[in-house]
Amino acid sequence: MGNKKSSNPVDTAAKIAPLDNKAYEKALRKLHVELVKLQRWVVHKGLKVCIVFEGRDGAGKGGTIKAITERVSPRIFRVVALPSPTEREKSQLYFQRYIKHLPAAGEIVIFDRSWYNRAGVERVMGFCTPEEVQKFLDGAPMVERGMVESGIILLKYWLEVSPQEQERRLRDRIDDGRKIWKLSPMDIKSFNRWDEYTAARDAMFAATDTAWVPWFVARSEDKKRVRLNIITHLLSQIPYEALPVEPVTLPKRKIGKMKQTNFPFRFIPEKF
């Protein structure tokens, strides 16, 4: 896989002190500037970029994607998070509902979970047969080769979290009214199937970690660090240049000559 330092992505090095907010925000600000440069380069060159994020529930996929996209244009950076397939979609070619979301020239598409649902949740929760899983594992590398040959820059990230940290985060979702929406009935059903998900992950890596689209594993025990590490890594995987920016100045404008309206504006209560 992308990082060969450890054969076991759960294997964690010595404990590192959590990154404080000030250091995190400073580093993230610099990376956001680089993402804006990348954005302009992708449009300028007509590049097609697709980034896949996978990992267990609570691994930090959503927070990482938000950190990537919060300072760029949603017209260029497009996030795809598909719901469960409809009955019609279930009757289609498995990859079909994902293919229509792939990037056109000048776009960066980020999948918050992807076609790899078949290798993970669908396999573990019994939503597909073992034969369908194997067919997917055999076919995914060829589909991805086709994407690359069509000119798509495809990056695949797996966020790895320990069972202890996952449990802490899921309990936090239960206790925090701002996060309870993140906890689905499927998350609860999946909670006791850690080993099954581990086996599914290992089979997925073995079958789909290819020379043309390898898997990159990011340890996500520290949410702040994994966001910075992933953004830094993806910037290193897409060659780009800083395009010249024309200086911008605001023109002079005239205000005050228009007669003020008597319209009774309905202002909202100012409680803060």
Q: Where are the model-predicted features located?
A:
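Glycine-rich phosphate-binding loop of ATP-dependent small-molecule kinases
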Residues: 1-272
